[in-house]
Amino acid sequence: MIKNGTCPFWERDDLSECARREYIEFKFPLFILLTGMIYAFCKVFRAFYLRRKNHTNEAPEFEEQGNGNHEYARFSVLRLKSAWESRSFCNVNNRSTFDKFKKFIEGAFIVLQLTIHLYILSNMPMDNKKFFHQGFLVQMFLWILLLVVITLRLISASQSFRWVLACKRDLWAVSFYSYASLFTLSILPLRSVFIGKIKDKIMVKYIISETFIDLALLLLLSTSSIEGTRYSFLVENENKKLPPAPTVFGLLTFSRIDRLIWKAYKHCLGNADIWDLDINNKSIAILANFEMSSKKGRLLPNIICYFKAVFISQLFLAFVSSFLNFVPSLLMPRILSYVNDPKSQSWNLVSLYVSSMLVSKIIATTCRGQGLFLGEKGTMQLRTVLISNIYSKTLRRTILKDSTTSLQKNASTSFEENPDSSEAEPRKKSSRKDNSVNNVMSIDAFKVSEAMNTFYLACEAVFMTVTALMILYSLLGWSAFAGTFALLAMIPLNFWCATFYGNYQADQLILTDKRTSGISEALNSIRVIKLLAWENLFYQKIINVRDGEIRLLKKKATIFFLNHLIWFFGPTLVSAITFSVFIKFQNQTLTPTIAFTALSLFAILRTPMDQIASTVSLLIQSFISLERIQDYLNEPETRKYEILEQSNTKFGFEDASMEWEAAETSFKLKNISIDFKLNSLNAIIGPTGSGKSSLLLGLLGELNLLSGKIYVPTVESRDDLEIGKDGMTNSMAYCSQTPWLISGTIKDNVVFGEIFNKQKFDDVMKSCCLDKDIKAMTAGIRTDVGDGGFSLSGGQQQRIALARAIYSSSRYLILDDCLSAVDPETALYIYEECLCGPMMKGRTCIITSHNISLVTKRADWLVILDRGEVKSQGKPSDLIKSNEFLRESINNDSKNTTHNQIDLKRSTTSKKTKNGDPEGENSQDEVCAEVENFEETKMEGSVKFSAYKWLADYFGGLGVVFVFTSSAILIHGITLSQGFWLRYWLETGSSGSKSTWLYRIVEGHSNIYFILTYIVIGFVSSFLTSGKVWIAIISGTNVTKKIFAKLLSSILYAKLRFHNVTPTGRIMNRFSKDMDIIDQQLIPNFEGLSYSVVVCLWIILLIGYVTPQFLLFAIPLCALYYTVCTLYLRASRELKRIDNINISPIHQLFAEAIKGVTTIRALADERRFITQSLVAIDRSNAPFFYLNMATEWITYRVDIIGTLVLFSSSVMIIMKASYLDAGLAGILLSNAFSFTETAQWIIKVFSSVELLMSSVERIKEYTDIPSESNGYISPPANWPQTGDVELKNLSLRYSPHSSKALDNVSFKVKAGTKVGIVGRTGAGKSSIIAAIYRLSDWENGTIIIDNKDIKHIPLERLRNSISCIPQDPTLFDGTVRSNLDPFDRYSDVQIYGVLSKVGLIEECDELSLISEQEQPNFSSHKLRNRFIDLNTVVKSGGSNLSQGQRQLLCLARSMLGARNIMLIDEATASIDYISDAKIQKTIRETMKNTTILTIAHRLRSVIDYDKILVMEMGRVKEYDHPYTLISDRNTIFYRLCRQSGEFENLFELAKVSFDNKR
């Protein structure tokens, strides 16, 4: 009995009458009345007061800061928010008509309640009138208050009471608070009615009616949308679907997602079915709030500051949930006491205990669900913050070297930076590789964000541990502290394991970065790798790194085993120590009630121990990832906003010196003074490596400015510039040497955020010679260019990049060698019609080029560079007279400077894919066919059984899986025997023995015997369970090793067609995210699933065996369990797949930003790209958000079902109390306690397994792709001995639906013959190389080399027998030697010989270099070139070399192997004409007996060859000596020579060659 003053609160088994009258009917309602009235009055008065003051001018939501800071203007999210809102519209999810009708019903119930009060008050007996008047009057006033509140809520729609809208939500809150409180107060009186404690009929009717009305009002309000909340959505698409308006019931039980789950059950979901996010969860709002709350400094304090409200809410919910979770354990001793002696307590009281268990678990489940969902929502928001900050940093990060070394501690230092780098290359100057940067976003950001989920679990674990220990102390006394000390002793072991685990994790991340970098490099260069037959080389390099990862995974598995053993054995050890101390030192009797209550508490303690251990492990990983993110955010940023000076009259340099890096060997531009002519064409020329590209990058502010000044028209953001009357802005547009395109349509790439003007667009297309290409494409300007433009030819990519600059509103254009990728005819057309045409009116253009004769014709200003210095500048006509280099270059270009008229209505050609359809000879139909494949397909339905079987086969088959599952059944049987052993111990009565331990050991059954046996059973069970997990993980690691090797082999040896139509990012997703899932998540989840299923089956069978009546509850509960699980699994599967697909665009945008950051910054378009990233993040967040809501939806329902299992078990136990002993009842309740958690775990793990199995499906899909057909007849070792090549009736198409790239091609090349292959872009030239290398399967025909049909020769043997110099110079991360001779087949003398021949080192230095290899002393030997020694670092893609230098190094690589056949694909396009002439001379002199097939746009390069093969539309049109063809006016070759602008020179060279060979 609990007393308060003179009024007892509880009498025997019910609430006392005076307590009901004083507290339930008076004091508590009075408190509700006063708090509700004060709160409502304050809110209404405030709203009325503000309305009267008519505060219509609201303060701006965000204050502008740093208005003079151009960098702030470009990157501040606060500045973006207003622009975002102006482009979108606000859609408000209004209340339904039915919700409005419910308010009238609510008012009617309140009136009814007042009527009932008046009726009872008027009919109350006089002797009770004074007391009852007090309580009734309070309740009447409370209902009058609620009537006023509902009235105000109803009249808020009236124009006369619009001020009420401001406090409508507060009024709604008062109503809900009152209804919920009143219903809660009515529960105990209603119980008194049911058990017959209240006899008065009027009071019985009153209590029943009051409870019913309170419940009805509560249900009405809980199921109606929350008033006063403008649940609005900032959307870009009017058709975007909105979720149902939130209700209290929907928020608490997650029923708000019911419609989406039901829709997913009926059919597969698509992106269009996913509801939009509300404004508060939009990325722009999240980032704006984060930016306002953040201070300069480290990321972690800012994250804590921003999410402090979430943390506090989770802390409170964890406290409530943790306490309520122990209510069943507190009530368990009373239930077991009743089972032990049914007469000790009344049935009413025991039924109250059982009901209290049900209610407490439901409330605890609700609090836990809300706490976890807050964490999951925080995960989404933190992920948004991290990804956005990383993306924004990428747009600010410097392109220069040594911006960081945090991810690559062992990275080598480059010998010199690229003086003539292209767009893709400058961005790679950082020593952090782009793929490592991508890991920061794709892996580290996700790991850190997942830590938000752990905060609630960590708080819950702490509270549960403390509460459990307090209850244990009250139950066992000070012996509970013995167990506590044992528990604390395990914490250092946990931290020791966590420390080792974290160290291994950090080492693994380094290897993962290295592996993904290697894979990305291989994928980006797959065509060259196949041409060089280096698949095995790259396969072995990647596998070696992977082996290191596998070793670390196994070490982590061992640490996990130790940690797992501690987790499982901990409760056994703690309970054994506690019981021993309790019996021996406290001399207490251990009863079943005490023992099984303590065991239930120890079982509950296992959960927080698990959570603490897993939380520590996850937090360590998260902190490691956070440090990596912090390191990235701390990297140096571009200084362009500081070093560029704005000027309206000057554009250029004033005594400026610039460099790539602060190193002696770094390339420098020295004392540059150039004043470019405004509204004119300015040309920059110079030999290869002179610094032309670096000069342009310096003008853009991308290099380090050592001294001097750089003047540009503006440094403001593109959005802030005013458009002039001519439609132009004072901004710059940049077109890089290597074209940079975004994934999207041709229109997207050209318009690039500008306003679309059809006439202007058509004019730009025509001037850039793209109009014919567009017409040839089925989709026209809507043709998707693919990943990096891989569906287009190199020429088309360059022209689209140029068109983007021309179409822009920029008045200043900076073009880096944009004419080298097109044939001479197209180059001349673009120069005349575009660069010197009407599109350039009022514009200033700066262009670099090797085509000196072309660009100098109409240039107004010419700058000549050499070795980073301006040698001369001025008008071209003046410089030609005085500059020897210029005069020599023009003479080499053309002795006839008068070009012939060309047909401006020329036809352009079709496309070329990035890696495989080299010149794009496949038709535009193929483009459209490929475009259909650009979007990643979403798997539908459940994961196929074939995927499970495929994975099981790697484990050894389904038999191994069966054995593994059977072992789980046996092991848990051992675990259950612990409880039965304890029951047996207690039944023996030995616990009360007073004999000495030594004597009883001799005699037999002593306490120590039982305790030691109990410990042994627990240890064996824990060891076997942990060992099973360890075996599973180790086996899984071996399986993932095999799967990775299979996947890598499948990708590397796949047909080139696969790489053409599959974006690199999609393939990388398999190697990174999907492989990481199989490595670290899938197998542990499989093991956890099997264990949880076994546990649940054991529990159900145990309870059903002891109390068969339980099966009556079990059947409907299982049916309900199955139903909700089925609904959830289908919905979660669809949402997860959409989430996986929607993440890819974020990776794509990030990869594009890395490659194109120079172009983006030049256009001052950072703000638009940040906005695009936010849109992509929102599209990814939507399915992620609703997936988490669906997860909590199922968790809540499974918890409720588990609570019902506990409740039904308890009911069965008290009903069969006379037939059960307390020990058996304790075993049943202990297991029933764990059923909820285990059942919930099954759903989570099973859904996780199915979701994770989608990664297996995706990987399996890529292991089944067709590989290249291999030959089976090995030719002789010296094949090809002579070099005869013959094509017979060869036809080739790149896809079944495309036109023929080669159509019945036949020609023969004799050994030692040099053949030039010419023709317009897309004529089929590069398809010949593709056919000879068998990069694509032929439709028909044969290719004979030295009397061998190459179709039957093994691919590696074939490709190793032919040398090739591809059009795109591809180098790999390593050294000069590893790029030239990765297999160490050649000596230094041979390597220096080819370097000398291609002009990378001077001939006089060759012997010096060889002698210095033994004792290098480069300080005393000054080189003119950048190659210090053969171990000089070459970065991935050759990014630290100029385009020309890369091409020369590739030429040296092909010349190193003495092969009898060489294929050259436009290998000198990026080299100046003088160097080109020298290289061609070298080729002719050193390869006299080699058969050479050269594709060339520069006709001068092949005019003295033995034969010219003219291709057109995939057919051979002409094949003869150059002189023969050029002498015939009717030949295509004659027309090509005429259109080149140097006909007379070509004719003379051809004639000399012809005469020399007669």
Curated annotation (Swiss-Prot):
Domain ABC transporter: 651-892, 1285-1538
Annotated spans, Disordered: 410-434, 892-926
CDD domains: ABC_6TM_VMR1_D1_like, ABC_6TM_VMR1_D2_like, ABCC_NFT1
Positions in the Cytoplasmic compartment: 51-103, 152-169, 223-302, 375-449, 505-558, 606-953, 1035-1082, 1133-1199, 1244-1558
Polar residues bias locations: 892-901
Residues on Extracellular side: 1-29, 125-130, 191-201, 324-351, 471-481, 580-584, 975-1013, 1106-1109, 1221-1222
Binding-site positions, ATP: 686-693, 1319-1326
Segments of skewed composition (Basic and acidic residues): 424-434
Domain of life of the native organism: Eukaryota
Bilayer topology term: Multi-pass membrane protein
One GO cellular component term noted in the UniProt record for this chain: fungal-type vacuole membrane
Residues bearing attached sugar chains per UniProt: N4
Signal peptide: none
Keyword set, alphabetical order: ATP-binding, Glycoprotein, Membrane, Nucleotide-binding, Repeat, Transmembrane, Transmembrane helix, Transport
Transmembrane portions of the chain: 30-50, 104-124, 131-151, 170-190, 202-222, 303-323, 352-374, 450-470, 482-504, 559-579, 585-605, 954-974, 1014-1034, 1083-1105, 1110-1132, 1200-1220, 1223-1243
Molecular functions (GO terms): ABC-type transporter activity; ATP binding; ATP hydrolysis activity
Subcellular location(s) per record: Membrane
Domain ABC transmembrane type-1: 311-621, 961-1251
InterPro entries (alphabetical): AAA+_ATPase, ABC1_TM_dom, ABC1_TM_sf, ABC_transporter-like_ATP-bd, ABC_transporter-like_CS, ABC_transporter_C-like, P-loop_NTPase
Listed Gene3D superfamilies: ABC transporter type 1, transmembrane domain, P-loop containing nucleotide triphosphate hydrolases
Pfam families per record: ABC_membrane, ABC_tran
Family: Belongs to the ABC transporter superfamily. ABCC family. Conjugate transporter (TC 3.A.1.208) subfamily.
Protein name: ABC transporter NFT1
Protein encoded by which gene: NFT1
